[in-house]
């Protein structure tokens, strides 16, 4: 496979940095990915030469900034194959996107006697907003359970979803287990039998695989910019146009109105601007547009193929470490969760950092998964398009040193 890993790595300045006098080995990409030079440079150019408010001014800077923002909306629509640019809403990130749906669609269409279905492998961002809604609306939440393999027990769907289910919320890829759910198959199964809306948390999928929202046939899809080599504080909510049109605004302010009158009431803007109150994160939008350009230039299918090969390499290496527990046999994306027996994940992470190795430890904002596996925390490595075999080799070498050191205290 002709994958330009050297050229790609040279595009990411942070990979040349040293941490604690050791070369940085960055394996925390599921938490946040790094930015290529083109994204960093584009943000600087915008902030230093192009900055202005959008949708407000008649002057050149404002008109250009508005055009750039709307062009990027169109670019994102094409990237995930949305039918219309108006189906793309800019939000702060995945968390805000899910909260927007819960607080607009959920508040409008979910009533007492209905139920919400989510899965046991969700990030807290796809659990807590629905719990809050369920408390307000007095409705039940049901859960699709996990299997020890790290897969969802899809056979239970028919027992859990019923005619009172209004929305099914599911992660595309588990942020801990690395499991890629068969979204298209699951949605088809559900929609063949029920009139149910489906929301997908795509935070861990967007940078690793081709997303086609029309083919998937989801009603909502959310992701964050910093997961796909872009800036923090910017994300995208995709929603089917016919649903967005029926949803009331969530936040009020400038940009989301057509007319404000003190006595006869306010009329709201068309979608998607109805959901974008106030001044947007224009710099973040500009950076996200450039990061998507970069991913398209490399090729998302090429990236997926490369990462799949790399994670297999990592899995083979890590399995050879004695007294290690890997928490999923269904690793098919970019993530490996593990613990060293007799060692706390916090200690492992702190000591790896001494060797310049960055991993994630803790409950990963997914406590229900921790409870399922009867642990308080896990270690997690996660790769990206710029990760390579030397990253894995250095990680393994450092992990063995950490294990040897911690063994002295057991």
Swiss-Prot record:
EC number(s) on file: 2.8.1.7, 4.4.1.16
Extract one GO BP annotation from the record: cysteine metabolic process
Alphabetical GO CC annotations of the entry are:
cytoplasm
Q: Which GO terms describe its molecular function?
A: cysteine desulfurase activity; pyridoxal phosphate binding; selenocysteine lyase activity
Compartment(s) where it occurs, according to its Swiss-Prot or TrEMBL record: Cytoplasm
Q: Which reaction does it catalyse?
A: (sulfur carrier)-H + L-cysteine = (sulfur carrier)-SH + L-alanine; L-selenocysteine + AH2 = hydrogenselenide + L-alanine + A + H(+)
Name the pathway: Cofactor biosynthesis; iron-sulfur cluster biosynthesis
Q: Where is the active site?
A: 365
Database matches in PROSITE patterns: AA_TRANSFER_CLASS_5
InterPro entries for the chain? Aminotrans_V_dom (IPR000192), Aminotrans_V_PyrdxlP_BS (IPR020578), Cys_dSase_SufS (IPR010970), PyrdxlP-dep_Trfase (IPR015424), PyrdxlP-dep_Trfase_major (IPR015421), PyrdxlP-dep_Trfase_small (IPR015422)
Keywords for the protein's UniProt record, in alphabetical order: Cytoplasm, Lyase, Pyridoxal phosphate, Transferase
Pfam families for this protein: Aminotran_5
List the cofactors. pyridoxal 5'-phosphate
Q: Which residues carry this modification: N6-(pyridoxal phosphate)lysine?
A: 227
Q: Does the keyword DNA repair apply?
A: no
Known partners and oligomeric status: Homodimer. Interacts with SufE and the SufBCD complex composed of SufB, SufC and SufD. The interaction with SufE is required to mediate the direct transfer of the sulfur atom from the S-sulfanylcysteine.
Which family is annotated? Belongs to the class-V pyridoxal-phosphate-dependent aminotransferase family. Csd subfamily.
- Which NCBIfam families does the record associate with it? sufS (TIGR01979)
- HAMAP family assigned to the protein according to its UniProt record, in alphabetical order: SufS_aminotrans_5 (MF_01831)
Function as written in the Swiss-Prot or TrEMBL entry: Cysteine desulfurases mobilize the sulfur from L-cysteine to yield L-alanine, an essential step in sulfur metabolism for biosynthesis of a variety of sulfur-containing biomolecules. Component of the suf operon, which is activated and required under specific conditions such as oxidative stress and iron limitation. Acts as a potent selenocysteine lyase in vitro, that mobilizes selenium from L-selenocysteine. Selenocysteine lyase activity is however unsure in vivo.
Question: What PANTHER family does its record include?
Answer: CYSTEINE DESULFURASE (PTHR43586:SF25)
Q: What is the designated name of this protein? A: Cysteine desulfurase
Name the species this protein comes from. Wigglesworthia glossinidia brevipalpis
């Amino acid at each position: 496979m002709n994958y330009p890993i050297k050229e790609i790595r040279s595009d990411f300045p942070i990979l040349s940095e040293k941490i604690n006098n050791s070369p940085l080995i960055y394996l925390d990409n599921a938490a946040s990915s790094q930015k290529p030079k083109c994204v960093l440079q584009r943000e600087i150019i915008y902030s230093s030469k192009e900055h202005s408010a959008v949708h407000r001014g008649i002057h050149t800077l404002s008109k250009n900034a508005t055009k750039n923002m709307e062009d990027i909306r169109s670019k994102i629509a094409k990237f995930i194959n949305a039918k219309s640019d108006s189906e793309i809403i800019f939000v702060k990130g995945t968390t805000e996107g899910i909260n927007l749906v819960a607080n607009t669609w959920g508040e409008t269409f979910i009533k007492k006697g209905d139920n919400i279905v989510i899965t046991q492998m969700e990030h807290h961002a796809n659990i807590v907003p629905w719990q809050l809604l369920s408390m307000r609306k007095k409705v039940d939440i049901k859960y699709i359970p996990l299997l020890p393999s790290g897969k969802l027990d899809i056979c239970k769907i028919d027992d859990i979803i019923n005619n009172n289910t209004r929305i099914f919320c599911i992660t595309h890829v588990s942020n801990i287990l690395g499991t890629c759910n068969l979204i298209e198959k699951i949605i088809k199964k559900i929609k063949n039998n029920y009139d149910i809306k489906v929301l997908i948390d795509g935070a861990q999928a967007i940078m690793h695989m081709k997303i086609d929202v029309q083919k998937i046939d989801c009603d909502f899809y959310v992701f964050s910019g910093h997961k796909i080599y872009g800036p923090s504080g910017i994300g995208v909510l995709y929603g089917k146009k016919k649903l967005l049109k029926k949803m009331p605004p969530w936040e009020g302010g400038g940009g989301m109105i057509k007319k404000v009158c003190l006595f006869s009431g306010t009329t709201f803007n068309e979608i998607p601007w109805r959901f974008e109150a106030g001044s947007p994160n224009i710099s973040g939008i500009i950076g996200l547009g450039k990061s998507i350009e970069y991913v398209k230039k490399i090729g998302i299918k090429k990236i997926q193929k490369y990462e799949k090969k790399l994670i297999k390499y990592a899995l083979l290496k890590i399995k050879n470490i004695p007294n290690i527990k890997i928490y999923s046999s269904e690793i098919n994306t970019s993530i490996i969760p593990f613990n060293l027996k007799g060692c706390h994940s916090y200690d492992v992470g702190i000591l790896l950092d001494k060797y310049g190795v960055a991993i994630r430890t803790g409950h990963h904002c997914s406590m229900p998964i921790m409870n399922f596996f009867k642990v308080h925390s896990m270690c997690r490595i996660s790769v990206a398009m710029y990760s390579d075999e030397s990253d894995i080799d250095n990680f393994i070498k450092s992990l063995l040193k950490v294990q040897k050191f911690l063994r002295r205290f057991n």
